[in-house]
Structures are given as structure tokens and as C-alpha cells.
């Protein structure tokens, strides 16, 4: 990603409302520097146009969900499989639109963006271990669908089973809408986890740096940033980031602050 792309990403994620599709496409510029978001936005427009006649004829949230599933799942072939969890492309919206394969959360972004273009109320739901979409409103009629399974309708029993597989019981809080920033944070966290090994440090680095550009992010990410910079040999910036993290976390976790300061001292010592 160029400095210009990162500046644009920052503007998008700090605007209201957040343009989720644009933010996800700008994220993809980290691996494809010449990526142009506009053709992919037009592709989302085209998917919405294809779904429009059936969606317009729907008279309930469940019928709207079924209409979207016909276009996005049956006709366009959007879905996923276990192998997609190990593929970085599954976390990049432009690749998901090209391949029509992806992680649940990126497939959900496709659904949300198509629904938005059609004026259909929809929101993302981050069930433990699996991301899905609700067609409808949080306080009114809604229907849960699983974009990873081609848009399969999820009755309450199926949603409860997904949550139960994570060792939990389904609660109302788990069905709450996710904001675009929360979705972006999860997307970037997925990239960070996929790139956890040393040979993928640079991929993990850009995921961390984009996370730090979000208006809200876990403080721990700043420490991770410092450690990555040190690991990649950027000792000055790494030590400075670890020190900044220590200053921020010190009032609530002095032990963590002391550890970070020790890491910063060791990094600076390597400069001599």
C-alpha cells in the first residue's frame, strides 16, 4: 500500500458512515499496490442489479434473504470451504469478488454491500466462531443467513448449534449488530493470525499497522507493532513503539509496562 492509499484508508475508516466496501478494498492494496477499488465497487453494483427483481418481489425478511441467496449463492457461486481459512486471499475483498470464495466475514461483507445497494436492511452478526448476516432490523423482523454456506437460512436452532460448537450458549448479545469498524478489526485480526509465523512477519506488520489506523483498537496491538518492528530489524522505531505502549498501559498494568520497557532497552542496546 502506498502512503496515499493508507491516507485514504484512514479517511474512510474515520468517516461516518464508514464505507465498508471501500475500506476492505483499500486493505487489499497492501498486497496489490496498483489495485483500483472502483471496478470492484461496480461489480457489487452489478450483483445488486442482478438480485433486484427477486428482492423487489419479496414481502418478508426471509423472502429477501432467499432472493439474495439465489443471486449470490446459487447463481454467482459465492461460498467457502475449510481450505479458505488458510488462504490470505480469503480475507481480501477484491480476491473474494474475483474467486467468489472467502472467509465467512468477507462473504458477509459482499452480502451486506449488495443488500445496502438494494435498500434492504441488513447487518453483520459475529457469532462465536462464525460470522453471519441478518436480513432485517435488530428490533423487528429478521432472518439469519450463512453466506459461507451459499446463503443458507439459519433458524434459531442452527444458530444455537454454531454457538454451542464453540462451547457457549446462544445469547441475545451474540446476535447484536456489528459496526463496520468492528468488522474491519476482525478482518485484520484474521490476517494477523494467519501470518503469525516469522516468515510472514511483513504481512502481519501491515495488518497491525492498518489496525492502528482504526478509530478503536486493542492497546495490545501497539506492543505487537513494536515487537514486529524489532524482529524485522527496525530497532529505533520498534523501541519507540514499545515505550509508547508502556506509557499507555502503565496505569492499568504496570507489569506489562515493565516488560515492554525491558524489551525497548534490549532493542536499543543492539544499536551499540
For each feature predicted by the language model, list its residue ranges.
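A structural boundary/capping signal
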Residues: 1-272
Amino acid at each position: 500500500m502506498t502512503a496515499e492509499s493508507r491516507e485514504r484508508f484512514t479517511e474512510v475508516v474515520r468517516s461516518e458512515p464508514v464505507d465498508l466496501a471501500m475500506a476492505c478494498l483499500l486493505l487489499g492494496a497492501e498486497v496489490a499496490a496498483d489495485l483500483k477499488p472502483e471496478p470492484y465497487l461496480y461489480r457489487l453494483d452489478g450483483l445488486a442489479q442482478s438480485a433486484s427483481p427477486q428482492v423487489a418481489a419479496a414481502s418478508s425478511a426471509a423472502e429477501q434473504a432467499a432472493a439474495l441467496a439465489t443471486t449470490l449463492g446459487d447463481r454467482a457461486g459465492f461460498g467457502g470451504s475449510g481450505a479458505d481459512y488458510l488462504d490470505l486471499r480469503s480475507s481480501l475483498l477484491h480476491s473474494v469478488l474475483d474467486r467468489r470464495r472467502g472467509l465467512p466475514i468477507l462473504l458477509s461483507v459482499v452480502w451486506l454491500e449488495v443488500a445496502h445497494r438494494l435498500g434492504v436492511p441488513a447487518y453483520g452478526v459475529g457469532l462465536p466462531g462464525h460470522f453471519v448476516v441478518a436480513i432485517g432490523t435488530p428490533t423487528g423482523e429478521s432472518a439469519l443467513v450463512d453466506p459461507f454456506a451459499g446463503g443458507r437460512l439459519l433458524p434459531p436452532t442452527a444458530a444455537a448449534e454454531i454457538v454451542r460448537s464453540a462451547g457457549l450458549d446462544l445469547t441475545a448479545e451474540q446476535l447484536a449488530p456489528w459496526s463496520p469498524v468492528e468488522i474491519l478489526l476482525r478482518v485484520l485480526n484474521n490476517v494477523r493470525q494467519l501470518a503469525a509465523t516469522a516468515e510472514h512477519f511483513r504481512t502481519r506488520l501491515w495488518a497491525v499497522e492498518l489496525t492502528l489506523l482504526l478509530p478503536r483498537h486493542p492497546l495490545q496491538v501497539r506492543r505487537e507493532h513494536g515487537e514486529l518492528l524489532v524482529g524485522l530489524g527496525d530497532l529505533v522505531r520498534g523501541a519507540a513503539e514499545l515505550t509508547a505502549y508502556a506509557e499507555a498501559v502503565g496505569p492499568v498494568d504496570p507489569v506489562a509496562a515493565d516488560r515492554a520497557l525491558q524489551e525497548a532497552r534490549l532493542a536499543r542496546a543492539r544499536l551499540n
